[in-house]
Design a protein with these regions (language model features):
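N-terminal pre-domain and mature-chain start segments
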Residues: 1-179
Length: 179
């Protein structure tokens, strides 16, 4: 990992992979540490063993599950994107034509914020909304994942009460994925 600054070399702004130059994390001004972007990481228990990673949809469902548990809210806004999300259900079982076995998932609703509503206006009107702590590039990726998961649903299930619906797969355990 290599850390770089984008402005005046005064502080670390981003952490990059030395081999492929992928951005692995960014400086978090609140903690003064580096917040790793987990969808871009692969894990290995041994130095020479093969690495294992999960797709972005799994990482974001874990991220949302952690955020709902630690912050005690289910509605979130993106700091840099004009969208809000609502974690509607954290424990949903479903099956499909591709897999007849039930899979565990999380139902997430998302929509564009109403014109003129910035993050602070939304939070002032509703104390049960929190801001997601993602880098701008991860916010974009997260929103793309929500759109992709929405497109997988039958048309009749793609929206609910003015919100778009996404069903994100959930990891069962550290050793397997059933989604």
């Amino acid at each position: 990992m290599q850390c770089r600054s984008l402005e005046n070399n005064d502080s670390i702004y981003q952490a990059h992979c030395k081999d492929c130059d992928t951005i692995l994390g960014y400086r978090d001004p609140q903690t003064e540490g580096i917040r790793l972007q987990k969808p871009y990481l692969a894990l290995s228990s041994q130095r020479d063993s093969t690495t294992r990673s999960h797709d972005a949809a799994h990482w974001f469902s874990c991220y949302l599950n952690q955020a709902t548990e630690t912050q005690g809210v289910r509605k979130f806004v993106f700091p840099t994107l004009p969208h809000e999300i609502w974690v509607f259900s954290t424990n949903l079982a479903y099956s499909s034509l591709e897999c007849s076995e039930p899979k565990q998932a999380m139902k997430v609703l998302f929509k564009a914020r109403e014109e003129g509503q910035d993050v602070e206006t939304l939070r002032a009107g509703n104390l049960l909304i929190e801001t997601l702590t993602l880098s701008p590039s991860l916010e974009e990726l997260f929103y793309q994942v929500l759109q992709q998961e929405n497109a997988k649903l039958p048309e009749s299930l793609q929206s609910l009460m003015g919100w778009q619906v996404a069903v994100l797969p959930v990891l069962y355990s550290s050793g397997s994925t059933k989604a």
